[in-house]
């Protein structure tokens, strides 16, 4: 089977590549990858090349396919797997394999990654339960289950303690105060959505950022009134220019501090602020992954000793987290499409990945069977004045107030003749 992929050849070197895949073994799957949402972690891998902990050497001869937030359709089933999978079945990939090497899809494999028209899912990924049946029909939601899975996993990884009781209580504090720092970006939107609609029931959620445009957009998507209807106080705060943001934010809790804090940017000042905002037994989750292996920040160890403050760091999520993300999306409790601001085809991947931090907006969603430059959804109407494809896409997203949706996805895929398989029960 001939495939077309976006692959990492070295530091800051991402190229399109077209080649013949080898025949699958009896314990492998050949799949068509319909969609892949671009993760900042992919940019980090492209930036560092083989210096990245998950990226192997010899990229020039064995380039690795980018992308891991993907979903698609099974095309061919190895003969030893026919009792579990069938041709035409839709799937979503759980890329967190948990291998000692750190290897996973989108970082480490020549034939296994989300930015591909076709890829081979290896035996090890299948044995680890990384191929989940997808019973829905909206591939964007399936791709976005992976970033939502990471967000959900972070909430589950936080913990709290009772003095002289030597078992941690996992998860955020019920009825507690949550602070989401640097959290008006694409992943932040998912974190706010889960805090409000994921059933964890904090009493207060404070969202902090310094980008007023991003804050205004997320307030439209997740208004304070929605949170209030669920018994949650939601507060959006722009700390840019504040003389003492810590004092202001602590005042929102009566100076008690925050029980659970999630840091969504690897910026020393943000981590230091999080430390100062912790309540007694407060848990700081360092969600953002730094590229600097020597990233260090001062931390108040007086409070660690006397106030039981503590830190966790999370990357990825479990299969159960992924299943929760899919289920909450299917019922409409979570709206992962809120994160998406740009749509593109496979041809757009190299430039998108290499310039990701400099492209404004939220998640960039790629359809591998489509040829299309990366385009902001907000620009569809203008482009539609001269291009009938964008004219119809603009009409379809207008029905959901500018949010990407299943109808728009189906129309786009149909225009390029992409086979979307079937939902196998």
Where do the PLM segments sit?
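Rossmann-fold NAD(P)-binding glycine/threonine-rich loop
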Residues: 269-272, 276, 288-308
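Short N-terminal strand-loop motif that marks the start
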Residues: 1-66, 400-425
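C-terminal hydrophobic helical "lid"/dimerization subdomain
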Residues: 162, 220, 243-250, 256, ...
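NAD(P)H dinucleotide-binding glycine-rich loop of Rossmann-like/cofactor-binding domains
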Residues: 95-177
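Hydrophobic/small residue at the entry helix of a nucleotide-binding pocket
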Residues: 186-187, 214
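Adenosine-nucleotide cofactor-binding segment
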Residues: 175-177, 181, 192-270, 393
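Helix-to-beta-strand junctions that scaffold the AdoMet/dcAdoMet cofactor pocket
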Residues: 278-280
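Glycine-rich beta-strand-centered segment in the early N-terminal region that forms part
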Residues: 22-37, 51-100, 113, 125, ...
